């Protein structure tokens, strides 16, 4: 059996909200993450779907500090030039917006319906 669970914390550097053709809400985030002070910023893409996306659209703003829990996913496609492309991202199951003015305490943890069923 294999294990696929990711927990990451970072600052939101980009946020895009859209609806799919069948009216599902999707929130795409890019988090800026640093391991240490003098290490370059790593950009990590995070995707929120459905009810989690609805909550994320309301609660998450650019420059918010988040803790995200989810699974690592990979998109694969062929571009116009015929080259195979891949992209890794985190499909979020939970997130918590941290209030840095209160010492990094979280407001509340928001989780997907699938995550609630597993508990």
List where the protein language model places each region:
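Short aromatic-glycine-enriched beta-strand elements
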Residues: 18-34, 86
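A beta-strand/beta-hairpin structural motif
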Residues: 35-59
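Short, Lys/Arg- and Gly-enriched loop/turn segments at beta-strand edges
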Residues: 75-80
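Short coil/loop residues immediately preceding or within conserved phosphate-binding loops
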Residues: 3, 7, 26-28, 41-43, ...
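OB-fold and OB-like beta-barrel modules that bind single-stranded nucleic acids
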Residues: 6-14, 31, 62-74, 92-95
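Hydrophobic alpha-helical segments of small multi-pass membrane proteins
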Residues: 44, 48-50, 87-94
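Short, conserved secondary-structure segments in the cores of folded domains
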Residues: 2-3, 55-56, 62
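Acidic, gly/ser/pro-rich intrinsically disordered tails
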Residues: 1-4, 16-23, 39, 83, ...
């Amino acid at each position: 059996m294999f294990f696929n669970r990711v927990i990451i914390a970072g600052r939101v550097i980009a946020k895009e909200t859209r609806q799919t053709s069948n009216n599902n809400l999707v929130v795409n985030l890019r988090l800026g993450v640093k391991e240490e002070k003098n290490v370059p910023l790593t950009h990590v893409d995070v995707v929120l779907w459905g009810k989690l996306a609805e909550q994320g659209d309301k609660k998450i703003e650019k420059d918010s500090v988040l803790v995200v829990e989810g699974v690592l996913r990979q998109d694969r496609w062929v571009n116009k030039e015929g080259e195979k492309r891949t992209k890794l991202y985190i499909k979020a199951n939970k997130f918590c917006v941290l209030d840095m003015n209160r010492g990094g305490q979280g407001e509340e943890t928001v989780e997907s319906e699938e995550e609630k069923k597993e508990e």
